[in-house]
Amino acid sequence: MPSHKTFQIKKKLAKKMRQNRPIPYWIRMRTDNTIRYNAKRRHWRRTKLGF
């Protein structure tokens, strides 16, 4: 990834950064909740974004 990024790439990276976080604590505490963790977590070294 070059140090000079285009704005489009930067926006995509920012979105992926936001997606790559654990689910909020209060969502797990809700009644009838079956979601235990974020199944779509991505590790920076294991899985690359592909752009």
From Swiss-Prot:
InterPro entries listed in its UniProt record: Ribosomal_eL39, Ribosomal_eL39_CS, Ribosomal_eL39_dom_sf
UniProt xrefs under Pfam families: Ribosomal_L39
Single GO MF annotation: structural constituent of ribosome
Keywords of this entry: Ribonucleoprotein, Ribosomal protein
A GO biological-process term: translation
Gene Ontology CC entries for this record: cytosolic large ribosomal subunit
PANTHER family per UniProt: LARGE RIBOSOMAL SUBUNIT PROTEIN EL39, RIBOSOMAL PROTEIN L39E
Protein family membership: Belongs to the eukaryotic ribosomal protein eL39 family.
Official protein name in the record: Large ribosomal subunit protein eL39x
